[in-house]
């Protein structure tokens, strides 16, 4: 059984509070992110479980708990914000062709679903047996995109954990991860191309590096902020590091001095149980920095003194010059090709010569600006620096190195000319109208 993704595979430091002391070094490596999941159960899966919606709901809740456990190594909290069971009929045509079904599901999310509910990433669970022994598929790097922040997963095993690994795998693709190669020294990890008989609950070091590159090149707003308690629909689970409906605090251990583990209610005299602005069960004083600025495009946030939560992550306006006019601010980062080359090829890399980028007007699998209905659209001459990124090393004979994965494209918001940046359509557009 395998994943259907077929591409070639190639911080900020927050103030540490009592509630964060249990973070592993891996979690401290990545900034906190939150993914609100929408799960859709197709009619075939509804029929598979004899129309027992309660059984399906319980199974999905268990899947979400497993996904959340696996994503902790990336410092990601996942919550179930929407569960929809297609009990009467499918709302899209679910086919044996995984690519076709994924395309239809993405289009439905963009045109129908987002008009009626808010979430970050949607997955379709199905009983359909896909061609080629495929059990899941998702676009690489599609997180937060209206059409591409989706995945399809076959409910292929009676064991909840095994299916949850596949769901995490596909969400990993959306977060910029590719399949683990032999050099990753982990043929059973979450991003392995083929699901093993005993899949691991761990991400490989390769996956962590890919995710770190993804965060370096992108700063998608949809996963920056914690959901409200009213945004979650799963049964409250104590110790999942998130406040859900019915909880005053997320206690976890009975030894928590702020929170009663039996009731998930605050102990007498406690103002809070966790949060960046909670210290020893009390609100941190107003003005205490709770989230440092991670770049000159970001804004540091401070506690208000009346809440345990750090204010919403904010940043300077998009288009503000940064890094000595080498770039323009975009969603709190200053994306420039130089740092993207370093992220892809190491500290000795630099941007390739201008002539390298002319290859992007070919309309090839690797050299293009956009993809439309499986057709690669060449870049217009003025847009070639918004397609594939070209890098080189100092004194390197290869002046036009490139990474043929999704991460090898020039990041949105990157400066492509004076007063211009790459927009979401991979056009080199005026910085005043590009966002």
From Swiss-Prot:
Superkingdom to which the source organism belongs: Eukaryota
Co-factor(s): Zn(2+)
Tissue expression remark: Expressed by the venom gland.
Major enzyme class: hydrolase
PROSITE patterns: ADAM_MEPRO (PS50215), DISINTEGRIN_1 (PS00427), DISINTEGRIN_2 (PS50214), ZINC_PROTEASE (PS00142)
Enzyme Commission number(s) of this protein: 3.4.24.-
Quaternary state and interactors: Monomer.
Function: Disintegrin: inhibits platelet aggregation induced by ADP, thrombin, platelet-activating factor and collagen. Acts by inhibiting fibrinogen interaction with platelet receptors GPIIb/GPIIIa (ITGA2B/ITGB3).
Protein name as it appears in the record: Zinc metalloproteinase/disintegrin
Species annotation: Craspedocephalus gramineus (Bamboo pit viper)
């Amino acid at each position: 059984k395998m994943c259907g993704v077929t591409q070639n595979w190639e911080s900020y430091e927050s103030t540490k509070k009592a509630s964060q002391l249990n973070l592993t070094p891996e979690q401290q490596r990545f900034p906190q992110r939150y993914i609100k999941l929408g799960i859709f159960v197709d009619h075939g899966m509804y029929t598979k479980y004899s129309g027992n919606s309660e059984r399906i709901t319980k199974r999905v809740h268990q899947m979400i708990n497993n996904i959340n456990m696996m994503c902790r190594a990336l410092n990601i909290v996942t919550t179930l914000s929407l569960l929809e069971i297609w009990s009467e009929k499918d709302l899209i045509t679910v086919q044996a062709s995984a690519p076709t079904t994924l395309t239809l599901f993405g289009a439905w999310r963009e045109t129908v679903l987002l008009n009626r509910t808010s979430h970050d990433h949607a997955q379709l669970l199905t009983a359909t047996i896909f061609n080629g022994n495929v059990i899941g598929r998702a676009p690489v790097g599609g997180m937060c995109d209206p059409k591409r922040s989706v995945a399809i997963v076959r409910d292929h095993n009676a064991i909840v954990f095994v299916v949850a690994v596949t769901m995490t795998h596909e969400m990993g693709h959306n977060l910029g991860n590719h399949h683990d190669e032999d050099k990753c020294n982990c043929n059973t990890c979450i991003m392995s191309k083929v699901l093993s008989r005993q899949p691991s609950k761990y991400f490989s070091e390769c996956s962590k590096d890919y995710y770190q590159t993804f965060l370096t090149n992108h700063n998608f707003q949809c996963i920056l902020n914690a959901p409200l308690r009213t945004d979650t629909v799963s049964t409250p689970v104590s110790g999942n590091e998130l406040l859900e409906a019915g909880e005053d605090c997320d206690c976890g251990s009975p030894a928590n001095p702020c929170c009663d583990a039996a009731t998930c209610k605050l102990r007498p005299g406690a103002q809070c149980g966790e949060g960046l602005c909670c210290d020893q069960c009390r609100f941190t004083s107003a003005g205490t920095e709770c989230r440092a600025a991670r770049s000159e495009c970001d804004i540091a946030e401070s506690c208000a003194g009346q809440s345990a939560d750090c204010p919403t992550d904010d940043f300077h306006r998009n288009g503000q010059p940064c890094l000595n006019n080498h770039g323009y601010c975009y969603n709190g980062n200053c994306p420039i090709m130089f740092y993207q080359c370093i992220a892809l090829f190491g500290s000795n890399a630099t941007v390739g010569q201008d002539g390298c980028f002319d290859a992007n007007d070919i309309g090839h699998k690797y050299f293009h600006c956009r993809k439309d209905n499986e057709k690669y659209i060449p870049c217009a001459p003025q847009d070639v620096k918004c397609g594939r990124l070209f890098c080189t090393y100092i004194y390197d004979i290869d002046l036009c190195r490139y990474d043929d994965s999704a991460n090898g494209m020039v990041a949105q918001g990157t400066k492509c000319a004076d007063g211009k940046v790459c927009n979401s359509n991979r056009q080199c557009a005026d910085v005043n109208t590009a966002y």
